[in-house]
Amino acid sequence: VIYMTKLLLLVLFILIPLTSNAISLNELRNNPTKYKLVYSDSSGDQYVDNDTINVIRYAPPYYVISSTSYLVSYEYNVLSELHNTYFYDYNNNISTLLEKTRSEQEFGSQVTQYAGIKYITNKITIFNYNGKVYQGPILRNESAKIPKILSPAYESAMYSFYKSYNTYFNIPSKIQKF
């Protein structure tokens, strides 16, 4: 009996850390000071966990910030926890590109190609809406990607920069939620 009790306690101590990071849709929605809604459309929402925003590099014009975001998919009835690292280059932000380019067409072309932000998703865990792990965690090893302007990844990068420095990296859009 003592052996079984010790074994049960050992299993519980091992499993508690695995479930402590679980998050539910209600927790995201009911804690707006901890989880900031940064993106929303008909198929999903994206939140950034304010407690996870961490400046890794401050070397103007270059900045690196990490944060955790939660992408809610209403299409697939899951939410994904995304551990991201964002790379910022102020020499290529929208304001700088406005000054550098000679025409609207050139500006539009450059902004859609690269507006000074890249990101890497380091780890993904997928949950159901009640917080039960559906898949993961999945560790990723990929090169940095350029997010599309106004995409969930772009808005999370913009918010992480804003929250870190109390200034916008790029000019805020009309649909921006912060």
For each predicted feature, which ranges?
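Sec-dependent N-terminal signal peptides
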Residues: 7-16
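N-terminal secretory-pathway/extracellular module detecting exported/lumenal segments
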Residues: 22-84, 89-178
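Short, Lys/Arg-enriched N-terminal segments with co-localized hydrophobic residues
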Residues: 1-3
